[in-house]
């Protein structure tokens, strides 16, 4: 039965072939592919495969047989060889791609030999009879978009890979409308040249750009725009390309810049959806490029095969015999021998009208696409979104842009947000047993708790991601590329940064910050100095040495004045009873305030001790009164300060401020290599900070550290020869951690704050900001700081980190007092010995004794109080004899003494 059925089919096919003429069952077509067109070649193969395997009930099938040449180097010689190879194989049409180096060679051969070229490459300039342009022109759509935005001053970046058609159209329109267009060819630019150009344009306040480049160069330009931070709000880019969805714009989504472009392929049409299902099933090893969705050039390639297939069907229906093409031919013959049916092929190609992946495929008599529609897309927070369309009839038509704030919020709630942070104690740390946990549970710290609180208020799921390079975020001065957490946000790798990230102007230009969740400033960390040992005479410290000198001079001065007034005042002179054997009063009335007694009186008053003598005269008592008042105040002040000085241990710090650091060279100082502290010194215009920056920048070895932990370790190991400049909050935290050997000195150098960062234009900005404000007003932020700074501190209570600490007195505190006591006692013994010897010598002369005998008699008397050898009582020499007598009566200037001596 199967044999009979097969014979019937063959018989039917034979009759159909006779009816349709001698049309071949296998149609030879050519394929020319240049470098970096793997995906286009995959689309070419897939289209041919689907055509050859798809049943057609209405017409007899025919197979497309491709002859493909891949040209690695698209020069004239390689293109000529490939084209001649195709021509010699008897192809009826060639599908091929070209660039600016091969376009003229291909079009010349096609015109000379009447071989039609179907191409998805850029449209050629001028008229090419045998070239069918699958790619629509962007001129009309781009000019309509510029009119809509009312741009009259912008930058046009282009290369010559696609010719000058768009440049010519824009410059003509600029001349008509008075536009100011800066046209710049970027064909020979490298990464550095792009960045320099963008920086220069930014200095000129250029914010609007039209970019007309092929996909590879376009992607490179966009990467450089991101690297210099020009993808933020305020910038607008129009991409003169038909594959808006083919471009990687993830980083621009978070940046906030407005990006507009055109999309030729509508991925929502049934035909495209069906092809995509088949595309995803392709083996990536056999079909390179199938791992990504087809680009618009691949869609044009697919449509090109459909156009060729439809052309051959039309030729067969018209009973045009193309079989006389032959299997050989000399493409270099002189004169050229064109293909006879080439005109019919070219005419039929231009008459084709089909629905392909790129919409309506139709050509004019010049072989250019007509009656096509392209969509206009803009980049939104959720990705590319259609905002309108353009066609020849309606021109630019914009559709209503429905607000999608709610949709954006819902999209955030339905996915996991990446939170970038940095390993920095006490903000983010690994738990002790973190190996037992997964995800966010591995971490603990201030920022971990803060992220949890913010997520609760916003209602999102999040994933903590540690920044790979371990940096906060700074822009390289040469490459203009951001690193650290700022780079993670700028380049779209994270959506929130919750870390000790300082709010600065340069960062605010590329990312958004919430209200500060912590206030701080730059501070100085040094190694805690050893406690100073009190000096022997530390009891003198309560008063300055100048005051002590003044007290000594005051003491001497008061004693001299007291001596003088006592001498001149008659009331200080009084009469004494006469000595033995004398009658009447003494010729020299006594005065108690000699110079030595005056000194003794002043010293006793100063020491707040009593004295056997006191002034009798009014003038002397005035001197004594003011001296007592003086000593009262001085002694009270001294006593008040003495308690504090003797019971407080002091640590002498070699550095107390930034000025101290700047004016010395013995102690080195530095900051983090990448962060706001370094940026503060680099940009500062204050003389002290400029001097510090000059030193830090030129210091060898480098004083910049990669991490805070490295800086702290350097402080601890430097034996007081290195100071680390860091945020005050981190300084205070480390001061509370063992081994408790660092300390903060001086005040903060500036005032700033830490904020939660989001990419520019992110829908998370407002919810995050409100969450931080709520946490601040509820006191949660203060509780978190106390928890991680002081409650978990290892160096005692919060106030124990002060520089002075009260303690019990030690012997060293009062050693000087004991020294003075011992010294005074020793001095007294020495003076007593001198007096003993002096009086013994005088006694020896008076008693006609030898000095040794006088010494022995004095010693015997001093020890035993015994009588000497001659029966004389040896008594210590006294200035006056003591007598017992009646009361003294003085009358008329005479003294009468009654004595009871026999």
From Swiss-Prot:
A lipid is attached at residues 611, 837 (S-palmitoyl cysteine). Glycans are attached at residues 52, 56, 258, 371, 407, 414. It is a multi-pass membrane protein. Disulfide bonds join 84-331, 740-795. One of its GO terms (cellular component) is dendritic spine. Residues 593-608, 609-611 dip into the membrane without crossing it. Keywords: Cell membrane, Cell projection, Disease variant, Disulfide bond, Glycoprotein, Intellectual disability, Ion channel, Ion transport, Ligand-gated ion channel, Lipoprotein, Membrane, Palmitate, Phosphoprotein, Postsynaptic cell membrane, Receptor, Signal, Synapse, Transmembrane, Transmembrane helix, Transport. L-glutamate binds at residues 500, 502, 507, 676-677, 727. CDD domains: PBP1_iGluR_AMPA_GluR4 (cd06388), PBP2_iGluR_AMPA_GluR4 (cd13727). Residues 566-592, 612-617, 835-902 are cytoplasmic. Residues 22-544, 639-813 are extracellular. One of its GO terms (molecular function) is transmitter-gated monoatomic ion channel activity involved in regulation of postsynaptic membrane potential. GO terms for biological process: glutamate receptor signaling pathway; modulation of chemical synaptic transmission; negative regulation of smooth muscle cell apoptotic process; synaptic transmission, glutamatergic. Belongs to the glutamate-gated ion channel (TC 1.A.10.1) family. GRIA4 subfamily. This is Glutamate receptor 4. It comes from Homo sapiens (Human).
